Amino acid sequence: MDERRTLAWHETLEMHELVAFQSNGLIKLKKMIREVKDPQLRQLYNVSIQGVEQNLRELLPFFPQAPHREDEEEERADNPFYSGDLLGFAKTSVRSYAIAITETATPQLRNVLVKQLNAAIQLHAQVYRYMYQHGYYPSYNLSELLKNDVRNANRAISMK
């Protein structure tokens, strides 16, 4: 395989998903650790925070290789974070329900899970539309999408 100077579109999008998910998760971990009193659990949070920070630091150098152009940076408020976290929750719910359905043999339970899967899909669509309409998820502008990932990852890493 030859050495490429740019990432492929599909791997760029996968990287986006990982960085967006981990950035939001890191912000939540750093906010929640303040409430954790148990020393052993607090240590687990610290290990998790350090691991996610390292993951982000290792992924960020690949962003310049993504197929996009550099744009100016802009400040972000909390609404993009909160809506992004909700979108991640909805997406994970869809995946979790889909997996659970494949493991379910009881028809009544399967029907309930399918109903709940459809509700999770609807929630995902609503949150996505909200984010897109407010400019928080520029899904048709890869350059802007990746710029947001880098900004959020750096914000999460620098957060105390």
From Swiss-Prot:
Residues cleaved off as propeptide: 1-4
Identification of the protein by name: Spore coat protein F
Location, primary (coarse class): other
Keyword Cell membrane belongs to the record: no
Keywords of the record: Sporulation
GO aspect biological process, one term: sporulation resulting in formation of a cellular spore
InterPro entries: Ferritin-like (IPR012347), Spore_coat_CotF (IPR016493), Spore_coat_CotF-like (IPR012851)
Modifications the protein undergoes after translation, according to the UniProt entry: Generates the two 5 and 8 kDa components of the spore coat, after proteolytic processing.
Subcellular location: Spore coat
Entry's family note: Belongs to the CotF family.
Other information: Present in an increased level in yabG mutant spores.
